[in-house]
Amino acid sequence: MENFKHLPEPFRIRVIEPVKRTTRAYREEAIIKSGMNPFLLDSEDVFIDLLTDSGTGAVTQSMQAAMMRGDEAYSGSRSYYALAESVKNIFGYQYTIPTHQGRGAEQIYIPVLIKKREQEKGLDRSKMVAFSNYFFDTTQGHSQINGCTVRNVYIKEAFDTGVRYDFKGNFDLEGLERGIEEVGPNNVPYIVATITSNSAGGQPVSLANLKAMYSIAKKYDIPVVMDSARFAENAYFIKQREAEYKDWTIEQITRETYKYADMLAMSAKKDAMVPMGGLLCMKDDSFFDVYTECRTLCVVQEGFPTYGGLEGGAMERLAVGLYDGMNLDWLAYRIAQVQYLVDGLEEIDVVCQQAGGHAAFVDAGKLLPHIPADQFPAQALACELYKVAGIRAVEIGSFLLGRDPKTGKQLPCPAELLRLTIPRATYTQTHMDFIIEAFKHVKENAANIKGLTFTYEPKVLRHFTAKLKEV
């Protein structure tokens, strides 16, 4: 098997969900009704759903079996302690708060860290800035809701789809330290390390880069939060690309990675493979005060701290999923599936970001050069792909990035990308071939695809619920 060209799916399919086929006319009507926003399509009208890998994949038999052990006690559930034990064993973090998903963790820790910086360091809320290699959209949104400006400090290779680089998700370390000095260290409430960097194309961050980032953070006494949705994929890339760790296990690399943060926030719906769940964890007693404050907010916003909006069975499933998501054979297959899709698209001259961990990212700016950024070329491409083949994908570009909350002007985006997100253990190689063929048809009509403008624009996280029309 070692020398075969393609890895088959390393699992057997036991339960299937039928999907319906629709006509072009049906899909054209559906996308117009949705306001040219694939988020607002009904799932039953989607043939292949590449909107997200968040909670949309299959679960393992061990995860499904674990649900039967669920303790549904309101407080002190043994299922909570099973989850907390998994966190200690995998990440080395002592304090665990479950949440319903990643944004549940964000809405808790962000105001707590801002308040802590204000009380201990005299943070000026009118000047505060948080830094990241690239903020995930909800992390950015929660920061802005709390009055915190966000700044992404990424390397120059990150968004250049013509460049191949092992760790495109890395922090620009000089830019990070320069930015901290500019705003004043006391006005930086937190640094977020996003692994992998979703907005850059599911690109990994090296351990060397994380170490250096953490050293800078410690120099200025700034807390570091690891945004951990795709921690296992990041560990796999480190094993493959960072020579020092080629003989380490995924578990060993993961444990080493989390030495270089103080807290973790996780949407467990990605690499932990669960349909619902999140985590907020603190490494040790130095953040016990933060843990205490976050537990209090959890009661108000998520639920009692030993369930955090999750039923007992869901916590048991997550406790197992954290391990199952680190399986080396599984990760090798998953990364290879994404690479297969990217290779197939590039063979038909569809320019992509180099293959990342969870999705193929098409360079819509190059495919549709006639559509300006403020008419959202990747969103227009998403709508066309749905019309042609019933495939739902998601824009990662100017539409998602949004406006400057202070000036109201569109923020400049480094690339206009269309994300084709692969749900875990859900689609086969035949589906990948169908997606590639769909892009052949899209390319034939590319010159006739029109840009988009708003008919309804929310002020925060607009890409989820906005409505548009063709220009």
UniProtKB/Swiss-Prot annotation:
Keywords: Acetylation, Lyase, Pyridoxal phosphate, Tryptophan catabolism. Pathway: Amino-acid degradation; L-tryptophan degradation via pyruvate pathway; indole and pyruvate from L-tryptophan: step 1/1. Its EC number is 4.1.99.1. The modification N6-(pyridoxal phosphate)lysine is found at residue 270. Disulfide bonds: none annotated. The modification N6-acetyllysine is found at residues 5, 115, 156, 450. It comes from the Bacteria. It is an enzyme of class 4 (lyase). GO terms for molecular function: tryptophanase activity. Its cofactor is pyridoxal 5'-phosphate. Transmembrane segments: none annotated. Belongs to the beta-eliminating lyase family. Homotetramer. This is Tryptophanase. The lineage of its organism: Bacteria, Pseudomonadati, Pseudomonadota, Gammaproteobacteria, Enterobacterales. The gene is tnaA.
